[in-house]
Amino acid sequence: MAKRTAVFCWTLTMDVYEILILILVLALVFLAILFYERSDTRQIKKAGKKAEQSVQKDLKQILLKDDLYFSNVNVVYGKQKTELDNLIVNKNGIFIVEVKNYSGEIYGIREDRKWLKQRFSGGGKLYQKHVDNPIGQVKRQEFILSRAFKKHGISAWVTGYIYFTNHNAPFADDYFIDSYRELKQIIHSRNDDPLTKKQILQIKALIEKKKLQ
């Protein structure tokens, strides 16, 4: 009887041991996946920051002597506020350049409020995320910036563009630019109602003194 009890206890102990081993293995797998995903997220953020810096550097290279360039400009009009990634000002106008460093594939149409961003991680896992339609974002930026300038007595045409660093725009649109050459041509095309030197200096002062915030 004692032997049978001992065998039963040993079997029970082995079962508990195997369960503990299984739990430990599962925990290690979970931690490995979590670490990989966090590492993947950090890499994406790092890539986004590098892309932003690269864009700013490339934008400056297409500017002419009299062009003004500003980055990360905060603008407030009434209860509305926005931040502009890149802003170029010259006699031909005021140009907003919104940079999107989307990886993977983008799905959506012009009328959609949200687009679907889809990509695969290095481990083959599918990631899907809904992002705001940047066309709506840029239209809003155009409105806020033009009204903010008008509040300070400057009537000027503000034009916004979206640059996809990975060239993965879901469709063709006048708001999208695909190369710096295209942008250079746009910002240096003759305007029938150009900004005066006085207006350009006023705009420069408003931005540098943060009076648009």
Regions inferred by a protein language model and the residue ranges of each:
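Surface-exposed interaction regions that form or flank ligand-binding interfaces
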Residues: 4-82, 88-95, 100-110, 114-213
